Structures are given as structure tokens and as C-alpha cells.
Amino acid sequence: MLDKLPILRTRAALRQKVEQLEAMSAEMKGLREQLSEMTALKRAVEKSTKLLETHKTPVVSAKDLKRIVKHERQNYREAPPFPNIVLDNFVDAGILRRVANEVAAMDRTGWHRTTTPRERKLSTEDESVFGPFTRRIFAALNSSLFVTFLEELTGIEGLIADPHLRGGGLHEIERGGLLGVHADFNFYKRMHLWRRLNVLIYLNAEWNEEWGGHLELWDGEAKTCVKRIAPTFNRAVIFDTSSRSYHGHPHPLNCPEGQSRRSLALYYYTVDYPYPEDLTPHSTLFISDQPQ
């Protein structure tokens, strides 16, 4: 009879409701955890899909290279102060952003550091420390497709890429750094080849003009700067090299601490050399070393 009393029946009903609510709460918690796991899985799948798409994307398209040759070949060969060209948005931006991120995260311990009045920079040509996208972009820029493009653009036949990246690879200039105006070494002893062409690609997003860091191309007498090129993200500079192709970054970099000027550098060679007056092998010729 006691369970038939109104107050006791009410308490029993309340207990039942509380138990039902607790069960529903536990079920909702489980559903939320499942939803969180599904959301994380979805993001992982999307990230993997984007990564796969990036792997399928060419570093630079053959169509774009043909277009550049068609429209810029003559401009390249006639450009002052020596054959050169500046190409913006040159490689796939997504791939280059990944390269920039890899380079930013690298341990600089094994990099070569130069600290002289005419040259203050870091560099590495050690491919074993490159990230996967960095290795991929260097492979593409040393490929037959790209070397053929360079031959057609510049008119230099028989170009040979350097798998060892001698003097090239990754370059970095920190605040206060510089690279004096110079002409490059002309003979590559290891491969018995003559240096003919430089390709530089810059990694610097949101570069501020006030920081400086411009690449300067000087006249053949090393007296006057003819062209200044800001090192902005995805800008490529291609130019002929000889003992009169003076260039450099001669003014100390004025970027904030923690910022730096980063670039990819690749050099190309030939067996023959068209400059009979310059057949004596030499190292880098800095104008600061020459008598005034």
C-alpha cells in the first residue's frame, strides 16, 4: 500500500527520470566523441587529398615554359646590362610555399656561414638535409624539360645541369648580411665544365621594399648598377654568366631580426666556352678586390 501513496510514487518517477537523463547524457557524450573523431578524420582525409593533389601538380608546367620562350626569348637576349629576365609567379605557388616552410624549419647547424666584409650569408648544397618538396623542386629545375627550356630561352646550346649544386642550393642572408658585386667563378673543376647560366628563385613572402635585399645587375665595367630586382616570393631571375656579368646584393640587409632573405640557386654549364679572352679558370671576382 505504501507504494500507492502519491508522494512515494512521485519519488519513484523522479528517480526513473533522473536515470533516463543520465543515460541520455552518457549517450550524448558518446555521440559527441564520435563526431569529434569523424571531424578529425575528415580533416586528415582533406589534408591527405590536398597533399596528393600537390604531388600531382607539376612544379612548372610545360605549357607555361613554351609560352615564356615564345614571348620572352628576344627580350632575354637583348636585356641590359647582359642577357637576363625576371619572371614572377614562375613555379607552382603551393609547392613553393611548402618549400619555404621546409627551409624555414631547417636546422642551420650544418650550413656554411660566410662572414667577410664582402660576403655575409649562409648556404647549403647538401641535398640530404632538404625536405621532400625542396628535393622535388631542385629535381624539376635540373630536369631535361627545364634545361631544354633554358636552352630555347637563352640560345645557349648543350646546357648541363649540376646534380651536386656546387655553390648553389639554398641561400640565406640575415639582417646586416650582403653579397658584394661580383662576377661568378667561370670553370667547374669537378665536372670540367664552363659556367654559363644562373637561375635564382626567391622564397620571401610579404617582402618589404624598405628592407632592401635587391639583386643588382651592373654594367660590364663594374661601374654602375643598371637593374635592381626585389627578392619577392616566387620571382625567378635567369641570367647569363661571364667574367663581365657583375651582380650582387651589396647593401646590408635592413630586415627585422628573425626575418631573412632566402633563395634557391641553380647553375648550368657547357663543355665549350664562347669567351676566348676568358679561358683562364678563376674563382669569384669581387669588384672590391679590383684596383680602382
Task: Go through each PLM region and give its residues.
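Coiled-coil heptad-register positions
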Residues: 29-32, 39, 46-49
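Eukaryotic charged/polar low-complexity linker/IDR segments
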Residues: 198-200
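Proline-centered turn/helix-capping motifs that create local helix->coil transitions or kinks
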Residues: 56-58, 107-109, 157-160, 205-209
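Short acidic N-proximal helix/loop "leader" segments that mark the beginning
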Residues: 46-79, 105-119, 283, 291-292
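Catalytic core of Fe(II)/2-oxoglutarate
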Residues: 2-30, 44, 176, 187-195, ...
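Non-heme Fe(II) oxygenase catalytic core, chiefly the N-lobe of the double-stranded beta-helix
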Residues: 101-104, 129, 138-195
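Polar helix-capping/helix-linker motif
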Residues: 37-40, 54, 65, 92, ...
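Non-heme Fe(II)/2-oxoglutarate
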Residues: 73-154
